[in-house]
């Protein structure tokens, strides 16, 4: 997450040292001499001391970021890395990096993502495996990985207002992430399976990571805090404004929003019972007359908008 945090610091302070350091981390990942080899030598160790079977793929350090073409390794770390790289691509307006990330997006969502927007299909390393390897019962599908996918999608949207990104955000918030928290908000899933047989989970070691009920807490409690953060900041994902001053409506929900454009403040009042009802009304109230564009997402699954 350091790349994301550094870009936020840059935006808050305007100090380019934070942006440059974030870019440095992106640029250095997977280059030679490999950081992990240097560290191992300093400790008088040989090779990696964790997840050795995955090698440097576990850390997304098997290749420089701009040479990677498939999602590999720890799924949460991968999503955060791609989100951080997208921040750098946007802030520096680097087209090459954006194109790499677009190909990576297509690999993740077209070949390595579940119908629920869960990602990361194997327990070992909480990681990706290979294209179309998406078992329903031994899935890992960590809640944090779907949240990271939303982070990645949001940043790609800021550069390319294509509905394919907001479609995945919507799919994740209603499925792959929402399954990670109980209705009362007190219990959580770390792993989000699509198929559960309680007796199998009890007796088969390769199913032990799959829980039949949401626990109240975890020793590694990243998901409860992350899912709470995501849903309390859901408004950040509903709209965006392009550099040209266009307002994009990405996610539908009952809400009111005040959006600042270059020379006018615009209030949007959205009324809907979505997703239970597909009817959505948007009242547009600018503070004074002016010309601007509002682009409303038509979901890819909507055949008759």
Language-model region placement:
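Glycan-recognition and catalytic cores of secretory/periplasmic carbohydrate-active enzymes
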Residues: 1-305
């Amino acid at each position: 997450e350091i790349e994301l945090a550094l870009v936020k610091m840059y935006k808050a302070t305007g100090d380019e040292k934070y942006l440059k350091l974030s870019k440095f981390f992106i640029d250095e990942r997977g280059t030679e001499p490999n950081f992990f080899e240097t560290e191992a030598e300093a400790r008088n160790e040989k090779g990696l001391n964790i997840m050795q079977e995955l090698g440097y793929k576990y850390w997304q350090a098997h290749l420089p970021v701009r040479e990677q073409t498939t999602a590999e390794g720890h799924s949460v770390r991968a999503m955060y890395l791609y989100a951080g790289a997208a921040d750098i691509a946007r802030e520096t307006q680097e087209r090459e990096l954006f194109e790499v990330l677009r190909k990576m997006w297509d690999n993740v969502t077209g070949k390595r993502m579940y119908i629920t927007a869960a990602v990361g299909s194997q327990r070992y390393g909480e990681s990706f495996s290979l294209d179309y390897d998406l078992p329903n019962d031994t899935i890992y599908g960590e809640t944090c990985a779907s949240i990271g996918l939303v982070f990645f999608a949001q940043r790609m949207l800021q550069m390319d207002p294509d509905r394919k990104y907001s479609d995945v955000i919507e799919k994740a918030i209603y499925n792959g992430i929402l399954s990670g928290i109980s209705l009362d908000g007190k219990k959580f899933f770390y792993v989000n399976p699509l198929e559960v047989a309680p007796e199998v989970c009890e007796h088969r070691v390769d199913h032990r990571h799959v829980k039949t009920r949401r626990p109240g807490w975890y020793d590694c409690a990243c998901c409860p805090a992350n899912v709470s953060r995501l849903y309390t900041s859901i408004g950040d994902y509903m709209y965006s404004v392009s550099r040209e001053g266009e307002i994009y409506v990405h996610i539908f929900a009952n809400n009111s929003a005040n959006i600042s454009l270059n020379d006018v403040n615009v209030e949007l009042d959205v009324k809907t019972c979505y997703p239970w009802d597909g009817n959505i009304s948007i009242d547009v109230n600018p503070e004074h007359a002016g010309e601007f564009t509002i682009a409303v997402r038509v979901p890819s699954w909507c055949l008759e908008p």
